[in-house]
Amino acid sequence: MAKLVSKIYGDALFETAVEEHRVDDFFEETEGILRVLEENEELSRLMSHPQVVKEEKMQLIENIFKGKVSDEIVGLLELLVEKDHFGKTKDVLVYFRDEVKEYKKIGTVHVTSAMELSKEQKEQVEKKLLETTNYVSFEMHYEVDTALIGGMVIRMGDRVVD
């Protein structure tokens, strides 16, 4: 159910962003909201608490976000409250972020190696990935796992290269 909710609302937000030529604006705004929600656990708990009435939650959204983010984003947050899905807000915004990255052909790659890679090795990995995929850039995440005997494991979405 959570995936369905995040997909429905995330797709609607993405379509609106594309239609209005505001993909970058919406992306920045949703990233900001994600930061606010992650830094303020009490806000998330309050917004999901069943004893706080919807009107109070709506007023809270207005007070916090109105004038700081677009009316479309405020409307989305209010709709999530209205439909009792505010607890899925992070999922919706992460889904939207992933859709934007795919739209802009920005891949996310997790590289795990047996030892720390040099700057040159990291550049070589990224260059090879750019040559062999349809992406124009990557968000690269590197991690060392001493349990690996040698080499590296590259994860990109649901693909794994060993």
Task: Kindly label every feature range from the protein language model.
Residues 1-161:
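Elongated, mostly alpha-helical coiled-coil "stalk/stator" tethers of large membrane protein machines
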